[in-house]
């Protein structure tokens, strides 16, 4: 591997360890020329399907985009970033295990809504209002009534 400091091509591994999550390998390397040390990480390349957008465009799955959407829905809610990352980890695992080469964006949106529905119903309604693009207040109210019928806790402030 090329040294990031001097560009020399010959480096040696001086230590290898399994990463915290067990899905990568952390390697300490030393350059044979400048003798500086640096860290590299090795992990299996994700084989995620392309996402088919509503307008039929295809684009790679973007973990950051999904996390961002969930974070916006969970803003000022008692949902940790670790919980959000677990939702996206689960989604990525499901996508990998599906073996599909392409998947419609609505399937991803529905999976996120399902996870939020079980986690925080206010975040669920926020996400659904953007994702489903309610056409009017009646559609929005129908969704709220469904949540209330399921025993959801929506408080008046």
From Swiss-Prot:
**Residues of the ATP-cone domain:** 49-139
Cofactor binding description: Binds 1 zinc ion.
Annotated GO biological process = negative regulation of DNA-templated transcription
Give the required cofactors: Zn(2+)
* unnamed zinc-finger residues: 3-34
Xref: Pfam families = ATP-cone, Zn_ribbon_NrdR
Single GO molecular-function term? zinc ion binding
| Family matches, as InterPro entries | ATP-cone_dom, NrdR-like_N, RNR_NrdR-like
Enumerate the PROSITE patterns for this protein.
Answer: ATP_CONE
Family recorded in the similarity comment: Belongs to the NrdR family.
> What is the documented function of this protein?
Negatively regulates transcription of bacterial ribonucleotide reductase nrd genes and operons by binding to NrdR-boxes.
Q: What is this protein called?
A: Transcriptional repressor NrdR
> What organism does the UniProt record list as the source?
Syntrophotalea carbinolica (strain DSM 2380 / NBRC 103641 / GraBd1)
> Lineage of this protein's species?
Bacteria, Pseudomonadati, Thermodesulfobacteriota, Desulfuromonadia, Desulfuromonadales
**Which gene holds the coding sequence for this protein?**
nrdR
């Amino acid at each position: 591997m090329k040294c990031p400091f001097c560009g020399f091509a010959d480096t040696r591994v001086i230590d290898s360890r399994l990463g915290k999550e067990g899905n990568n390998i952390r390697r300490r390397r030393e350059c044979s020329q400048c003798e500086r040390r640096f860290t590299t990480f090795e992990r299996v390349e994700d084989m995620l399907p392309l996402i088919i957008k509503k307008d039929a465009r295809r684009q790679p799955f973007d973990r950051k985009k999904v996390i961002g959407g969930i974070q916006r829905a969970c803003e000022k809610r008692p949902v940790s970033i670790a919980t959000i990352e677990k939702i996206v980890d689960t989604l990525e695992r499901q996508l990998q295990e599906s073996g599909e080469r392409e998947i419609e964006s609505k399937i991803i949106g529905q999976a996120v809504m399902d996870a939020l529905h079980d986690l925080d119903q206010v975040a669920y309604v926020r996400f659904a209002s953007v994702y489903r693009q309610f056409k009017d207040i009646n559609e929005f109210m129908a969704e709220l009534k469904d949540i209330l019928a399921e025993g959801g806790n929506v408080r008046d402030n």
